[in-house]
Swiss-Prot record:
One of its GO terms (molecular function) is L-ascorbic acid binding. Fe cation binds at residues 98, 100, 155. Its cofactor is Fe(2+); L-ascorbate. This is PKHD-type hydroxylase P9211_12561. The keyword Zinc does not apply. Keywords: Dioxygenase, Iron, Metal-binding, Oxidoreductase, Vitamin C. Binds 1 Fe(2+) ion per subunit. The keyword Transferase does not apply. InterPro entries: Oxoglu/Fe-dep_dioxygenase_dom, PKHD_hydroxylase, Pro_4_hyd_alph, Pro_4_hyd_alph_FE2OG_OXY. HAMAP family: Hydroxyl_YbiX. 2-oxoglutarate binds at residue 165. Its EC number is 1.14.11.-. Residues 80-174 form the Fe2OG dioxygenase domain.
Amino acid sequence: MELLIHQLLSKEESKKITSNITKDNSCWIDGKTSAGSYAAKVKNNLQLKKDSEVGVTNSNKVNNKLTSDQLIKSFALPRKVHGTMFTRSSVGQGYGMHVDNAYMSSGRSDLSFTIFLSSPNEYQGGELLIQSMQGVKEIKLNCGQIVIYPSTSLHSVKQVSQGERIVCVGWIQSYVANNEDRNFLFGLDAGARGLLAKHGRSDELDLVFQAYSNLLRRLGD
């Protein structure tokens, strides 16, 4: 499972965050300021100042939701959620193909995430394109939904042709850096939890959870 799509925020939570962060246009700056020298050449959007009061308050809200969500914890094994910021793209703006930096001042990027705060009918274009060995996946989600995908992936955002696209993006430093190892662990954990819910505890299931914990010890950093 290369990526996870999940309803993280309710529509009401998403709209409240959007209302909070768009009240003061002076808090928004050129998105190029947070991009690496290569990615900055293809980045064309605005981002909320990370150190602004509204930026800190709302990014903390998002981080708390992320780190308390059981499905995300199982999928991503987050050691640290970092670099969380809000971006907006108006007509003609987007982000060309690029890969995220492996290391940032805030931590290592194992997984990248985008939380869609605008509803799909509020803008045209703005699809997130993620490139993999299987081809390019085009993603445009409902308000409050998150997509988490490997930071090793080339990805881009199509130009917005109508309306405005507002999202929250950030990175996860995982306890398990390798994507394939992390996917194996997620499948094992999901299967074990499913069996526990369906059949209850058993000696055999204890061995499965033991294997999971010991694999995590071996594969983690």
